[in-house]
Amino acid sequence: MNMARNVTDLLALSQQEELVDLPENYPLSTSEDEGDSDGEGKRQKLLEAVSSLGRKNKWKLAERSEASRMVSEFNVTSEGSGEKLVLSDLLGSATALSSVAAVKKQLHRVKSKTLTPPLNKEEADRALREAAFSKTSQMLSRWDPVVLKNRQAEQLIFPMEKEPPAVAPIEHVFTDWKVRTPLEQEVFNLLHKNKQPVTDPLLTPVETASIRAMSLEEAKIRRAELQRMRALQSYYEARARREKRIKSKKYHRALKKGKAKKALKEFEELWKDCPNAALQELEKMEKARMTERMSLKHQGSGKWAKSKAIMAKYDPEARKAMQEQLAKNRELTQKLQVVSESEEEDGCTEEGIVSVSHGMDDLQMNADGVNPWMLSSCNSNAKRGEIKTDPEQMPEFVAHVSSESEGDERPVAEELVLKERSFQERVDPNNAKLMDGQETEDSDSQEVLQKLNKESHQSDNQKVSSEENVLHIQREDLASEKLLVLQRLERAHVLEQQGELSKEEHYPKKGLSRPLLKGDWKEMKPLTNPDASGGKKKKEQMIDLRNLLTANSSPVRSLAVPTIQQLEDEVETDHKQLIREAFAGDDVIREFLKEKREAIETNKPKDLDLSLPGWGEWVGMGLKPSAKKRRRFLIKAPESSPRKDKNLPNVIISEKRNIHAAAHQVRALPHPFTHQQQFERTIQNPIGYMWNTQRTFQKLTVPKVGTKLGHIIKPIKAENVGYCSSTRSDLSILQSSQKCLSRKQQKQLKKLSSAD
């Protein structure tokens, strides 16, 4: 600063007028004498300024050295006096002013009161925390309605702010588009060649040019023609919609037949006009049929078929499409059977064989595919159907069916014994006499067996008159039935040997004799000795399988019209018979009992053996710990409580606690519910798509929170809820107490305010 001031003084002095050198004898006047003195003063100042260059001395204030009447308050000194200067002495002359009186009062008030000392660190922190807590609680209390609303909402979808979709006009998209592939190049060439517009106006440039070239009359004719075409198009569309809604099978059959005739007629005309083209068309049709059959695209394993199968429950069009596809699949995969001349002479037409194959397909196909349990029965039925298409053999087939239906109503045990006896009589008549000793004690069952024997003899007489191939097929069927009988009797024998089932009062306590094969009759003769009490032979006891996979006998039918109850009973018996035939080869009951026995053993408490080898005795190869020591360190398990399924032979009740299921158990009433009955009623209602419609199922299983892919979920703002943001006013209490805070706390407050 001193350097700058010196430089300014030098510049000011340089601008003064230069001194003129005069001769030594030149006389000076009084005015000139004064100017000379002024010049010397200026020169003296210049020398002082030059000498002060480079020094760092402060600018010296000018001091008053002479006495004066006017005393200034800006430069008051107390030198020369023994007393100090007091403020009241200076204000003594200003007592009359009103403003000065107010200042005096303030001075007296300040003088009378002492200043409070600053707060220590602990108290300052406590005051800061209290102020921050009160203000923060006041700020957060505004969000209570928003939080409550979000908690009670059924579904929240984020992000909440819906951004308007930015749709760019097609002109901008088209300008930035660049052709990259040869296909795009060809498309663009065609568009520009035909002058197709970029946008989608009502008329193309070609149409506008043609309209402009037309006269008024031509335009009217053209307009009328277009109106007529639109009317015809609407008529055809309405007619097609009406035809599509027709559900008559007869109509669709006639329509399909008409289309087939029309196609055949067109093919004949094409054959007459151009045989080569007709051959090519025929070859194309055959090739298309071959490719469809090889690819098997009409099955239900494709993506389209799976999607249609999902919607078939709700959409009748999808159901119809699935039925058409299955019909097409059956038509393509059907084996074409060539009929020989001998079969044509016997009267076996091609239609009968195709119907049998259709019946086979219907029997073998179910919802998931081929049923392996029905293969044997279907094959036997198919053979019978192919052979018994002769009208002379139809009564025998009807009698066979009626005998089967009546056999379903009889007890199963009588049916088994009858089949075994009839099979023995057919295969070996000499050994049939050995079966006479295995009759039942009940007179009613004996009469039923006699009637059944008569019916079997009558059927045998009819079958003897048939051809040799029919006898061969019947022997195969009887052999399969014999195996079925043996398996069922063996399974009943195993059930009777079980200790758990023998305790039940529903099952007979006497043992069941295993059915004997043809080679076991010789071994049976020395064993069949009379009892000690009497010389009578033991008769075979009838098997009571009512508690197994059997149906109760239905009452005898009357010749009147069957009632609804009888029809329902017939359906039930047929269903149970189908189950028996399906599980004939599997020993389901034995496996079930084995599984139950294993479950009981695993859940039974086990003894704890605490004996350690090598403590108090020798240990090595071939040495076993003593039984006394094992008994000493053996902790026996407490007796378990009796199982709930102890007296239930066909039930397994698992008493093991499932940890995963226990995690989902409710120990307290959930948040939305207020009563226990309300919660239980809600839990009992099914939410699956098997019990509800598709729309209701989607509503019940909608997620609580829904998000969109690729969207950023930002925190909620006060502006979105309807509040005005006042972050600066929120810190007003904190900023008012900055004086009693430390520097570190003040810096933190500044950071908070700058962040807001």
Swiss-Prot record:
Residues 21-44, 419-468, 497-539 are annotated as: Disordered. Residues 215-244, 316-345, 449-476 form a coiled coil. Residues 419-428, 452-468 have a biased composition (Basic and acidic residues). Keywords: Coiled coil, Developmental protein, Differentiation, Meiosis, Nucleus, Phosphoprotein, Ribosome biogenesis, Spermatogenesis. It is found in: Nucleus, Nucleolus. Its main location: nucleus. Pfam families: Utp14 (PF04615). InterPro entries: SSU_processome_Utp14. Expressed predominantly in germ cells of the testis; weakly expressed in brain. The modification Phosphoserine is found at S29, S31, S37, S554. One of its GO terms (cellular component) is small-subunit processome. GO terms for biological process: cell differentiation; meiotic cell cycle; rRNA processing; spermatogenesis. Apparently encoded by an autosomal retrotransposed copy of the X-linked gene Utp14a. Evolution of autosomal retrogenes from X-linked progenitors compensates for X-chromosome silencing during male meiosis. Belongs to the UTP14 family. Essential for spermatogenesis. May be required specifically for ribosome biogenesis and hence protein synthesis during male meiosis. This is U3 small nucleolar RNA-associated protein 14 homolog B. The lineage of its organism: Eukaryota, Metazoa, Chordata, Craniata, Vertebrata. The gene is Utp14b.
